[in-house]
C-alpha cells in the first residue's frame, strides 16, 4: 500500500527525491536530440517512468527500476543514433519495457539488492582507490559485454584501485558481478522487447 510520501521511511523518501531528479536530467539528455517527434515521445515516456517510480516504497525496487529505466534510455538513444529506433517505436518499446519490468521485478529487485549490499560492504572498507574504481566502473558499464577485452580493462582498473584480497575487494567484485548481471539482464529484456516491436 502506498500512503504518499509523508508516511514513508525517511531513507525511501530521500531516495525518491534523488532518483526523481535523475529523471529530470534524463529529459535534458534523452529528449533533446533535435528530432521533435522522438523528443516528445521520450519526454512522455520519462514522465511516465518517473511517476511509476514515485509510487514505489521498497528501496531496492526503486533502485532496480531506476537502473532498468536508465539502461532503457541509453539503449533507445543508441538505437536512435543508429537509425534503428524512431519516435513511434521508442514509445512502444518503452511501454513494453515497463510491462517487462513488472514481469521480471523479482529478479531485477534481487539483483539490485545484492549489488547494493555487496557495494556497501566494499565501500565501508575502502576509499583510497576510488578514482581508479570510478574510471573502471565507467568502462565496465559501457564496455559492450561483447567486447570482453574492454570489460576486462575496466575490471583491472578497478582491481588496481584496491587489493583484491581485502574485504572491500571482495565486496566490490561481488558488486560488479551483480552490476554486470543486472546490466546483462536488462539488456536481454531490451533485446527481446525490441525484437518483438515492429512499427
Give each language-model segment a name.
Residues 133-150, 168-184:
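Short hydrophobic alpha-helical membrane-entry/anchor segments
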Residues 18, 25, 32, 57, ...:
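Conformational-control "hinges and anchors"
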Residues 1-13:
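Short acidic, low-complexity intrinsically disordered linear motifs used
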Residues 105-131, 142, 146-162:
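Membrane-penetrating hydrophobic segments
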Residues 97, 101-107:
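Membrane-proximal, non-transmembrane alpha-helical segments
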Residues 33-69, 74-77, 81, 85, ...:
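Amphipathic, membrane-inserting segments
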Residues 12-34, 42, 51:
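Charged, amphipathic alpha-helical linkers/stalks
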Amino acid at each position: 500500500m502506498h500512503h504518499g510520501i509523508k508516511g514513508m521511511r525517511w531513507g525511501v523518501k530521500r531516495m525518491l527525491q534523488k532518483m526523481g531528479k535523475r529523471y529530470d536530467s534524463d529529459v535534458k539528455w534523452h529528449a533533446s536530440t533535435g528530432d521533435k517527434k522522438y523528443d516528445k515521445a521520450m519526454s512522455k515516456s520519462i514522465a511516465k517512468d518517473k511517476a511509476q517510480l514515485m509510487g514505489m516504497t521498497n528501496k531496492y525496487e526503486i533502485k532496480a527500476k531506476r537502473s532498468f529505466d536508465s539502461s532503457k534510455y541509453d539503449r533507445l538513444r543508441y538505437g536512435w543514433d543508429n537509425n534503428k529506433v524512431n519516435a513511434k517505436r521508442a514509445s512502444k518499446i518503452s511501454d513494453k519495457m515497463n510491462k517487462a519490468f513488472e514481469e521480471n521485478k523479482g529478479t531485477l529487485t534481487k539483483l539490485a539488492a545484492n549489488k547494493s549490499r555487496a557495494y556497501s560492504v566494499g565501500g565501508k572498507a575502502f576509499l583510497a582507490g576510488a578514482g581508479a574504481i570510478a574510471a573502471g566502473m565507467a568502462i565496465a558499464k559501457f564496455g559492450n559485454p561483447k567486447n570482453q577485452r574492454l570489460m576486462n580493462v575496466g575490471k583491472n582498473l578497478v582491481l588496481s584501485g584496491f587489493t583484491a584480497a581485502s574485504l572491500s575487494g571482495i565486496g566490490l567484485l561481488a558488486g560488479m558481478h551483480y552490476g554486470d548481471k543486472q546490466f546483462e539482464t536488462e539488456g536481454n529484456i531490451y533485446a527481446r522487447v525490441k525484437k518483438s516491436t515492429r512499427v
